[in-house]
Amino acid sequence: MRVIAKFGGTSLGSGDRINRAADSIARTVEAGHEVAVVASAMGSTTDDLLGEIAFEAAASDRAEIVSMGERTSVRMLKAALSARGIEAMFLEPGAELWPIVTNDLGEVDVPETRARAETPAAQLERVVPVITGFLAENQAGEITTLGRGGSDTTAVMLGSYTDADQVVIVTDVEGVMTGDPRVVEGAQNVGRISVDELRNLSFRGAEVVAPSALSYKSNGLAVRVVHYQHGDLLSGGTDIEGEFENIIDMQEASLSCPPVAAPSLPTSPGILAALSQVLRAAGITIDAVSTRMDPLTSYLTESRPTAPENLRPSNCAAARP
């Protein structure tokens, strides 16, 4: 079985925890499995480094500075694996085998990254690559970052692009819980959860798996969350089931977009209900609504233009109950 194991900052937060992580990796390799490791910065290193930048730094310089957390982690973990007789190598941006590339927009260059991931994947039978999470490089070879939760994204992305069987997210909680165990007494582990359910929890503040990572989850890729104290990469925790589905609804049909403008209109109580009543009376369906400080724009499925006088703020105000 091919496994991508991602160790978060807490699970690598001390020498003892690095030893625990190395032991779990070594046991998995010795059981005959192929393992690639993604490592976050130790503990709060990234936040500490960011906090010490008390000057105006270019984005490229900031990326270089914060990358030192992950760069240290992969060296520590690689050394711990070597001490256990496991053939390992660390990979960081700039290395010949580095896989993750971003484009001019700072987004992952999917075709390039997918192609590059094939090379380290082909070596998994004989070596364990320990890869810096969160980091990438652009076409010019400069370090870039994948944003908050970027190590989760690194792991699930590489799991998808290397045809892994399973991605294991090693963190400081026993998988997904019924509540925050630091706050809710008696919180229990949820054995299984769907991608959609976990994504909704993530958008509401649950810090389990980054939403950006879930976008790379497919039905053929198992993803599991386990506690670093568990010590076993192949059991326990919470299984994340299903496949990511894009929640953006794309339509090719033409839409009318009449704006309604007045000072502080979107914050006026009852304005949306009033607008809806005016349009319903005209037999027009609202497809979506967009608000800013002053204008309120409706996207209408009706192909013919709406008479402007019908959408005057005074008419909308008159329609309020």
Write out the residue ranges for each language-model feature.
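Nucleotide/pyrophosphate-binding catalytic subdomain
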Residues: 1-213
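Short, glycine-/Ser/Thr-/acidic-enriched flexible segments
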Residues: 9-10, 42-43, 136, 151, ...
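Structural beta-strand/beta-sheet cores of well-ordered domains, especially the beta-sheet scaffolds
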Residues: 3, 127, 165-166, 199, ...
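Structured core elements
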Residues: 4, 11, 36-37, 145, ...
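Flexible, glycine/charged-enriched surface loops at secondary-structure junctions
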Residues: 34-37, 209-210, 221-231, 282-292, ...
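A conserved regulatory-domain signal marking ACT and ACT-like small-molecule sensing domains
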Residues: 235-321
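A conserved active-site cap/scaffold subdomain adjacent to cofactor or substrate pockets
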Residues: 199-257
